[in-house]
């Protein structure tokens, strides 16, 4: 699952390549839009909204895409070899005189009227990297379902937009609670820190090629992807277990010593509350 900073970087690359330029190539390789031709139109801007990308073109149209797990946008110069995947994985090509943007494996690709963009993104909560960021509303959204596990609430883009699986695990570590802690049991002081901390992490990483949360040289992340290596703070083995149901199930990392709250037992059942 992409993080908000990843999508922000993709939007910036696309904006730098396309905005203000006339499209000389337009090729939508999905049946619904196979006959759509945007050539001759100027790209106005490319804007991220949470994990969604909105490419606006003159004439009041927006190309809406979402990367989800495997999608990507690549930008190529004339004559450069395309390296985003095999040709059958290409979903859309938008080209100008000096750059070509290619969307690979995009699970969501729509064309809508710019005036109706809310149909695609109106359900999203405050965007951590957007102009609509509202920490109080984000926290209110999270608190609206007290029994819900914090990790699942953080991934719900209706609460706040931009957190993916990496930041879910890292935020919970920095707050000192497990991702299975019910939102209603999050101590008030940590709840108050959460929105600001989340925004700080994404803003710090939106211009970096490698995501970092630790500030430690040679160690990029506190827990994500580190199981069963030692915790960077206490030396306890970092653990991993799946959180969520069905298609929403995600590998989730935590330190059983540094993080308080319920966590899966070795057999996978949630219920153990480690001491701090």
UniProtKB/Swiss-Prot annotation:
Record: active site: 2 (schiff-base intermediate with dna), 3 (proton donor), 51 (proton donor), 250 (proton donor)
Taxonomic superkingdom: Bacteria
UniProt keywords, alphabetically: DNA damage, DNA repair, DNA-binding, Glycosidase, Hydrolase, Lyase, Metal-binding, Multifunctional enzyme, Zinc, Zinc-finger
Entry GO MF terms: class I DNA-(apurinic or apyrimidinic site) endonuclease activity; damaged DNA binding; DNA-(apurinic or apyrimidinic site) endonuclease activity; oxidized pyrimidine nucleobase lesion DNA N-glycosylase activity; zinc ion binding
Cofactor(s) the record lists: Zn(2+)
GO biological process: base-excision repair
Residues in FPG-type zinc fingers: 222-260
Binding site for DNA: 165
Pfam families linked to this entry: Fapy_DNA_glyco, H2TH
Catalysed reactions, semicolon-separated: 2'-deoxyribonucleotide-(2'-deoxyribose 5'-phosphate)-2'-deoxyribonucleotide-DNA = a 3'-end 2'-deoxyribonucleotide-(2,3-dehydro-2,3-deoxyribose 5'-phosphate)-DNA + a 5'-end 5'-phospho-2'-deoxyribonucleoside-DNA + H(+)
Cofactor binding annotation: Binds 1 zinc ion per subunit.
InterPro entries linked to this entry: DNA_glyclase/AP_lyase_DNA-bd, DNA_glyclase_Znf_dom_DNA_BS, FPG_cat, MutM-like_N-ter, Nei2_N, Ribosomal_uS13-like_H2TH, Znf_DNA_glyclase/AP_lyase
Cross-referenced Gene3D superfamilies: 1.10.8.50, MutM-like, N-terminal
Protein task: Involved in base excision repair of DNA damaged by oxidation or by mutagenic agents. Acts as a DNA glycosylase that recognizes and removes damaged bases. Has AP (apurinic/apyrimidinic) lyase activity and introduces nicks in the DNA strand. Cleaves the DNA backbone by beta-delta elimination to generate a single-strand break at the site of the removed base with both 3'- and 5'-phosphates.
PANTHER family: ENDONUCLEASE 8
Family label: Belongs to the FPG family.
Entry protein name: Probable endonuclease 8 2
Species the sequence originates in: Streptomyces coelicolor (strain ATCC BAA-471 / A3(2) / M145)
